[in-house]
A protein has these predicted regions:
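Glycine-rich, low-complexity intrinsically disordered segments
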Residues: 1-146
Length: 146
């Protein structure tokens, strides 16, 4: 399934020309996770530890958001929120994943390239105080289920 992905980080503008997400940052790839330090392998009682929520990382083209993201990383700028949208592409696009982050800072930005690339890319990492994940189930035809 082909997808379109976009992120909005505070007031920073990207170069998306999508009619629904114009001005957001086009996302090429993203990664995020969390881990739990359970103790079930240490005998009876199997307690759960404290969750470790990782920073979210995304890959994007170098664009007009680049220098603003760099500046935000250098200054430790705090943004009220950031929102990542993943949408099924096609005639009837369906936004099926939405991750909203609150109290966001840019924790890293790395860029580079080689002569063989069409466009330069960069990786950006965000840290946040809280998050909300929303998921929209799809029906067999690719539309919204419920």
């Amino acid at each position: 399934m082909a997808v379109d992905m976009f992120i909005k980080v505070g007031t920073i503008e990207g170069e998306s020309v999508d009619k629904t997400h114009a001005g957001k940052i086009d996302v090429l790839a993203w990664s995020w996770g969390m881990s739990q330090s359970g103790t079930t392998h240490q005998g009876g009682g199997g307690g759960a530890g404290k969750v470790n929520v990782q920073d979210i990382s995304f890959t994007k083209y170098v664009d007009k958001s680049t220098t603003n993201l760099m500046s935000a990383c250098c200054k430790g700028t705090h943004f009220d929120d950031a929102v990542l949208i993943v949408r099924k592409a096609g005639d009837k696009p369906l936004e099926y994943i939405k991750i909203t982050m609150k109290e966001v800072i840019v924790t890293s930005l790395s860029t580079g390239g080689s002569g063989g690339e069409d466009r330069l890319t960069e990786n950006v990492t965000l840290n946040f105080a809280e998050f909300k994940v929303e998921y929209q189930e799809q029906n067999p035809k690719g539309g919204s289920k419920g």
